[in-house]
Swiss-Prot record:
Origin: domain of life: Eukaryota
Name of protein: Ribonuclease III domain-containing protein RNC1, chloroplastic
Family annotation (SUPFAM superfamilies): RNase III domain-like
GO CC annotation: chloroplast; ribonucleoprotein complex
Targeting presequence: 1-51
Chief site of localization: plastid
UniProt keyword annotations, A-Z: Chloroplast, mRNA processing, mRNA splicing, Plastid, Repeat, Ribonucleoprotein, RNA-binding, Transit peptide
Keyword RNA-binding in annotation: yes
Function noted in UniProt: Binds specific group II introns in chloroplasts and facilitates their splicing. Acts on both subgroup IIA and subgroup IIB introns. The substrates of the subgroup II also require the CRM domain proteins CAF1 or CAF2. Binds both single-stranded and double-stranded RNA non-specifically, but lacks endonuclease activity. Required for plastid ribosome biogenesis.
Alphabetical list of InterPro entries matching this protein: RNase_III_dom, RNase_III_sf
Pfam families linked to this entry: Ribonuclease_3
Location relative to the cell: Plastid, Chloroplast
Length: 537
């Protein structure tokens, strides 16, 4: 390789290959060995063209002259590679808003307009709807409400104390999936993503409670398969088409002719966001109505049945209200606990804690471990009961439920399949998810749903859940069988999933007995999931 001029009259120096491996612009540089020559001929140098203007006086200088070498090196430095692409404007950071503009933006936001419904308020758009948004509402909203079975009157006519007053706005946001035209607006995109972030956990919790009460003897494995067969993303287009909503999601395409990766993400996004809006405005009973009446989900359909597996014989009793009948969605949606009920969700408690647990009352764990566990968790809570016997009965059931939370499947599952924490763990996972989702939505008003999803996942990673339980030294009270006790005590790969399951079972028990407020107390005050409380030195 050498630097040479292409002709005596040429003014350009070009890199050209030659049989003699020498560099002609300097005699002071020795010849390179063949290895160095192969390095210089790499692809990153092939596209680099060195152009230098050779003046007459440079040509007149001898080859060994230092002035000639300096001039050629100076010209060589001016050679540049290909121009770098300028990043798109949306990736260029903008200067932050000053305090005055930021305060105005938040104070004028609809998200701070409802003091009595903080969760609903946090899911409203960050700015008021504009004319383009209202155009979509005028054209399509009546069709949506008619398909879902709602009144065609504008929801703004309702009173301020009714959360359904904002249903039209949330319903509009629910259908603005990321692939549609209106999703480019910031308030629409963030509003839709925040709704689907909440809606996915609403669906999981609703179907979990439904199947736990419908199948009081079944383990969580088959129930998870039933839930997936109803709301798995590959099945959602079928439900959207059953409600005749596909033209609102794909106004320019035939949904049946789209490939899966183009059809399923928008449908899933709209489906989740729709149930987030329904839950915020009407609560869980309306979620059941839309699922089973509007979309026509059938839990008894052949495609919704779990795969056949070896079932352990269940010889224990179930509660009287489950005996001899299978509950339907109407029974669960319309159920209201009696005034003197022991628990916030009495039927769900009976579905998770078998009546036979009373045989463990007064055992060694009940006397030795239960007081320490209850003291750590802050139980029993103070309740305003009319009759003293109700308080005593609740505390007895609370103790039995706590013992079930710490009862590992290795102890009694093969003889008594429901004498373990699995069913409480299942409902605890879902109530834990929705409690954290509501917390993040109210805490981060301007965050999009995708960011909240990642934050949610990191805060609730299984290994962290078990770690919080171990920090309270509660893992020492888990009841293992004698055969596996030493293995679980000294092997973290076995111990950590078990402690995670116990923590989720505790959340499930708290939900069934005291309701969602106690789940929040355990997560954010006792176990400090967000790790924001000062640590004891």
């Amino acid at each position: 390789m050498e630097l040479c001029s292409s002709s005596p009259s040429s003014s350009l120096l070009r890199i050209c290959s030659s049989s003699a491996p020498e560099i002609s612009f300097s005699s002071s540089i020795s010849q390179f060995p063949s290895k160095t020559q192969s390095i210089l001929t790499k692809s990153r140098f092939q596209n680099l063209r060195i152009c230098a203007s050779v003046t007459a006086e440079t040509q007149g200088l001898p080859r060994d002259s230092p002035q000639r070498l300096l001039k050629e090196l100076a010209q060589r430095k001016t050679a540049t590679g290909p121009k770098k692409k300028v990043p798109p404007k949306r990736f260029i950071l903008r200067p932050p808003l000053d305090d005055k503009k930021l305060a105005e933006r938040f104070l004028n936001s609809p998200q701070l307009s409802l003091k009595s419904f903080p969760l609903l308020s946090s899911c409203l758009p960050s700015s008021k709807l504009n004319n383009a948004d209202k155009t979509w509402i005028d054209e399509y909203l009546l069709e949506v409400k008619q398909a879902l079975g709602y009144s065609l009157e504008p929801s703004e006519s309702l009173g301020d104390d009714n959360p359904a007053k904002h249903f039209d706005t949330l319903l509009y946001l629910a259908f603005q999936h990321p692939s549609c035209d209106r999703a480019r607006a910031r308030h629409v995109k963030n509003g839709h993503s925040r709704l689907w972030f909440l809606g996915q956990y609403v669906l999981e919790l609703a179907l979990t409670e439904f199947f736990l009460q419908r199948y009081p003897r079944e383990s969580p494995g088959p129930m998870r398969e039933r839930v997936f067969a109803l709301i798995g993303k590959r099945y959602l287009p079928k439900w959207i088409k059953a409600a005749s909503l596909q033209n609102l999601i794909f106004p320019y395409d035939d949904m049946d002719k789209l490939i899966r990766k183009e059809r399923e993400p928008p449908v899933k996004s709209v489906f989740w966001a729709l149930f987030g809006a329904i839950y915020l405005c009407f609560g869980m009973p309306e979620v059941y109505r839309v699922l089973f009446e509007v979309f026509g989900m059938d839990p008894d359909a052949d495609e919704c049945q779990p795969r056949s597996r070896r079932q352990l014989e269940d010889v224990d009793y179930v509660s009287v209200e489950f005996e001899g009948k299978k509950l339907g969605w109407q029974d669960i949606a319309t159920y209201k606990p009696p005034e003197d009920a022991l628990f916030a969700h009495p039927r769900l408690f009976r579905a998770c804690v078998p009546p036979g647990m009373h045989r463990f009352r007064g055992n060694i764990w009940d006397f030795d471990s239960k007081p320490k566990v209850m003291q750590t968790l802050g139980y029993p809570l103070t309740m305003n009961d009319r009759i003293k016997e109700i308080t005593e009965a609740r505390n007895i059931e609370l103790g039995l439920g706590l013992q079930l939370c710490f009862l590992h499947p290795s102890k009694h599952k093969f003889e008594h399949p429901r004498f373990c924490f699995e069913r409480l763990e299942y409902v605890g996972q879902k109530i834990q998810d929705i409690a954290m989702a509501e917390r993040l939505l109210m805490k981060h008003l301007d965050a999009p749903g995708k960011w909240l999803q990642e934050k949610h996942r990191r805060l609730l990673m299984n290994k962290f859940c078990g770690r919080y339980l171990r920090e309270k030294r509660l893992h020492n009270f888990i009841i293992y069988s004698e055969e596996v006790h030493d293995r679980y005590e000294h092997n973290r790969r076995l111990r950590n999933p078990a402690t995670t399951a116990v923590q989720q079972a505790i959340h499930g028990l708290a939900y069934t007995i005291y309701g969602k407020p106690d789940v929040r107390r355990l997560m954010f005050e006792v176990f400090d999931f967000e790790q924001i409380q000062p640590k004891a030195v």
